[in-house]
C-alpha cells in the first residue's frame, strides 16, 4: 500500500512538470513558473525545470532571476552538451537584457570555444558586441549569422539591431541582400 502511494505521488509530481512544459509552450509564463518551481522543489528533472524557470523569468522581464535559474541549471549534474549550449545562449540573452555586457560576452565566448556556432549564436554574439561598441566584431558576427541563415527574418533582425544603435546604413545592406535574392 505504501508503495502505491509513493507511485501516485511520483505521478502527480510528473504531471506538474508536464503541465509546466505545456504552459511554457502556450506562453502562460506565470503558471509555468509556479509549476517549474514546484518541480525543482520536488526534484523532478531539476536542470530542465531550472531552464523552464529561466525562460519564464526572461519572458516576464525578470532578468536577474532568469540568470540565476540558468546558472542553477548549468550547475546540475544531468546537463548534456546540447542543453548546456542552450542554457549559455539563454543566459547570455538574459545578461544582455539586464545590461551585464561583459558577462553576456563571456557566455558568448564559452559558446564559441566549446560548442557549434549556428546563426542564432552568431547573431547573439554580434548583438552583444555591438552593445559593447565592438563594431568590427559585430559586423563579422552578423556576417557569420547571415551566412548560416540568409532568411528575410534574419536580415530584419540584423537590420533592427543596427537601427537601434542609430546605424541604419550598416543594417540596410542585409535588407537589400535578402530582397535581391528573393526577387530572382
Q: What do the predicted segments below correspond to?
A:
Residues 21, 55, 93, 127, ...:
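Residue-level recognition of tetratricopeptide repeat
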Residues 52, 86, 90, 124, ...:
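Canonical tetratricopeptide repeat
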Amino acid at each position: 500500500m505504501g508503495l502505491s502511494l509513493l507511485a501516485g505521488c511520483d505521478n502527480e509530481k510528473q504531471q506538474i512538470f508536464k503541465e509546466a512544459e505545456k504552459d511554457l509552450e502556450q506562453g502562460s509564463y506565470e503558471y509555468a513558473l509556479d509549476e517549474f518551481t514546484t518541480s525543482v522543489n520536488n526534484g523532478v528533472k531539476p536542470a530542465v525545470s531550472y531552464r523552464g524557470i529561466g525562460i519564464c523569468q526572461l519572458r516576464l522581464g525578470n532578468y536577474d532571476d532568469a540568470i540565476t535559474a540558468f546558472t542553477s541549471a548549468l550547475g546540475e549534474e544531468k546537463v548534456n552538451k546540447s542543453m548546456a549550449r542552450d542554457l549559455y545562449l539563454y543566459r547570455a540573452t538574459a545578461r544582455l537584457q539586464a545590461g551585464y555586457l561583459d558577462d553576456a560576452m563571456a557566455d558568448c565566448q564559452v559558446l564559441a570555444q566549446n560548442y557549434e556556432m549556428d546563426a542564432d549564436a552568431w547573431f547573439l554574439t554580434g548583438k552583444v558586441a555591438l552593445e559593447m561598441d565592438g563594431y568590427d566584431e559585430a559586423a563579422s558576427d552578423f556576417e557569420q549569422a547571415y551566412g548560416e541563415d540568409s532568411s528575410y527574418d534574419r536580415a530584419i533582425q540584423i537590420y533592427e539591431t543596427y537601427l537601434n544603435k542609430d546605424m541604419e546604413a550598416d543594417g540596410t545592406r542585409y535588407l537589400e541582400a535578402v530582397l535581391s535574392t528573393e526577387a530572382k
